[in-house]
C-alpha cells in the first residue's frame, strides 16, 4: 500500500486550517482535514496524476482538491511526501 508522509509544514497547514475553521464549526474543520488526507491517499496510489511544478522545485507536483486547498507533493517510489496544503487564494 502506498504511503503518505507529511512534512512539518504540511502538518502545520492542516492544523492552521482546522483551527481557523473550527472557531465557527469544528465538524466542518474535521471534514476538511479528512478530505485533504483522503485526497493525499489517492495521490499516493497515482502520484503522477498531479501537475508538474518544476518552476517551484524539481519533482514537485500539485493537485487541486474538492476543497479550497491545493496539495503540493513529491512522488516517491512507494507513495508521496506532502510538502504543503495551501489555500488556493494564497500566493
Residue ranges and their predicted role:
Residues 3-60:
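Basic, Lys/Arg-enriched alpha-helical interface segments
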Amino acid at each position: 500500500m502506498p504511503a503518505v508522509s507529511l512534512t512539518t509544514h504540511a502538518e502545520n497547514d492542516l492544523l492552521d486550517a482546522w483551527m481557523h475553521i473550527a472557531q465557527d464549526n469544528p465538524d466542518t474543520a474535521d471534514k476538511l482535514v479528512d478530505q485533504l488526507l483522503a485526497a493525499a491517499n489517492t495521490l499516493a496510489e497515482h502520484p503522477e496524476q498531479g501537475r508538474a511544478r518544476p518552476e517551484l522545485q524539481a519533482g514537485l507536483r500539485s493537485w487541486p482538491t474538492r476543497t479550497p486547498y491545493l496539495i503540493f507533493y513529491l512522488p516517491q517510489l512507494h507513495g508521496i511526501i506532502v510538502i504543503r496544503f495551501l489555500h488556493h487564494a494564497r500566493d
